[in-house]
From Swiss-Prot:
It comes from the Viruses. It holds the Pfam family Corona_NS2A. This is Non-structural protein 2a. Belongs to the coronaviruses ns2a protein family. InterPro entries: Coronavirus_NS2A (IPR007878), NS2A-like (IPR039573). The lineage of its organism: Viruses, Riboviria, Orthornavirae, Pisuviricota, Pisoniviricetes. Gene3D superfamilies: Cyclic phosphodiesterase.
């Protein structure tokens, strides 16, 4: 089956960098050097890494949202990982920093999003980078500008661990920027989410069940639609959109997860009441 590529993207997975103050201080230092040298360019005001380009519609947001959460919950942190930013270079019309350390994250995001049936990544090879500025056509044609950019020095590392402020976001191309960040559709903290308290007692009661009849007995009358397919869909909605429910069902009850996804009971009669003998 041919792979569909986002060669005409309309969204991207964003890794914002504004919250890393030490990096931003050095990043802005590079931008100041460009302006001080008189290089005609448009400065990037929302430093970030584009981890994957997407060709999706609003009805795909939920699927991509869940894929991002699955990537985060499947991460093997250890002591964390480092993102390394190296000397500026010219990529197309942009002045960018070379970025290393997020290749595996890029691959995971693309694979998980594609598994949801959504279009991710482009046919050309993905190159990790962080844009500093965009050159005008006139500036790009001036040899002195190119020589100056190639002479600029930059070397910085960010350590990403469960307590760092790293986030993964869905951003629409052309989204507004404010205070160094893009307007987002979805934004998730990447840290390990140690939350063991259910948001409601009802979700706590049904977590782990894979029989709709038993779920209905645990909940109050009217909590679920009478139609079985509609009831499973409601449970699936909670599974995909409630982070506590998602994490605990994902980790502790594969049967319930499959039931939600298939809108069907997987209990095989195991939850039926035993017949009392005379």
């Amino acid at each position: 089956m041919a792979v569909a590529y986002a060669d005409k993207p309309n969204h991207f997975i964003n890794f914002p960098l504004t919250q890393f103050e030490g990096f931003v201080l050095n990043y802005k230092g590079l931008q100041f050097q460009l302006l001080d040298e008189g290089v005609d360019c448009k400065i990037q005001t929302a430093p970030h890494i584009s981890l994957a380009m997407l060709d999706i519609q609003p009805e795909d947001y939920r699927s991509v949202d869940v894929a991002i959460q699955e990537v985060i919950d499947d991460m093997h942190w250890g002591e964390g990982f480092q993102i390394k930013f190296d000397n500026p270079l010219i990529l197309g019309r942009c002045i960018v920093l070379d970025v290393k350390g997020v290749e595996e994250l890029h691959d995971d995001l693309v694979n998980y999003i594609r598994d949801k049936g959504c279009v991710a990544d482009q046919s050309r090879k993905w190159i990790g980078h962080c844009t500093i500025a965009q050159l005008t056509d006139a500036a790009l044609s001036i040899k002195e500008n190119v020589d100056f950019i190639n002479s600029m020095q930059f070397n910085y590392k960010i350590t990403i661990n469960p307590s760092s402020p790293a986030r993964l976001e869905i951003v629409k191309l052309g989204a507004e920027k404010k205070d160094g960040f893009y307007e987002t559709i979805v934004s998730h903290w990447m840290g390990i989410r140690f939350e063991y308290n259910p948001p409601t007692d009802k979700l706590a009661m049904i977590m782990g069940y894979c029989c709709l009849e038993v779920v209905r007995k645990e909940l109050e009358e009217g909590d679920l639609p009478e139609n079985d397919d509609d009831a499973w869909f409601k449970l699936s909605y909670h599974y995909e959109n409630n982070s506590w429910f998602f994490r605990h069902v994902y980790r502790k009850s594969s049967y319930f997860r499959k039931s939600c996804q298939n809108l069907d009971c997987n209990c095989l009669g195991f939850y039926e009441s035993p017949v009392e003998e005379d």
